Amino acid sequence: MKGMILFISCLLLIGIVVECKEGYLMDHEGCKLSCFIRPSGYCGSECKIKKGSSGYCAWPACYCYGLPNWVKVWERATNRCGKK
């Protein structure tokens, strides 16, 4: 019984520590990375380059899952797109 409780506790701890980020990728200007006229699989490739687990075109921008915490993703509160 103690072993089962320890096992479940470890799983919960791993879930907290291995938390990953998700969101819209940004271009060099701080805007969402567009996929409007890109080929199929473009967003998945871009997400993999950023070490994400997967991604897709959430028209019209690339959305990624499983990104490391160092990757900057677009956020409404800190949006700098088109601003100087």
Curated annotation (Swiss-Prot):
Gene Ontology, cellular component aspect: extracellular region
Entry keyword Lyase: no
GO MF term (any one): sodium channel inhibitor activity
Location within or outside the cell: Secreted
Endpoints of the signal sequence: 1-20
Biological processes per GO annotation: defense response
CDD domains according to UniProt: neurotoxins_LC_scorpion
Tissue specificity field: Expressed by the venom gland.
Transmembrane segments: none
Modified sites of kind Cysteine amide: C81
LCN-type CS-alpha/beta domain location: 21-82
Homology family: Belongs to the long (4 C-C) scorpion toxin superfamily. Sodium channel inhibitor family. Beta subfamily.
Written domain comment of the UniProt record: Has the structural arrangement of an alpha-helix connected to antiparallel beta-sheets by disulfide bonds (CS-alpha/beta).
Protein name per UniProt: Beta-toxin Tf1a
Species annotation: Tityus fasciolatus
Taxonomic placement: Eukaryota, Metazoa, Ecdysozoa, Arthropoda, Chelicerata
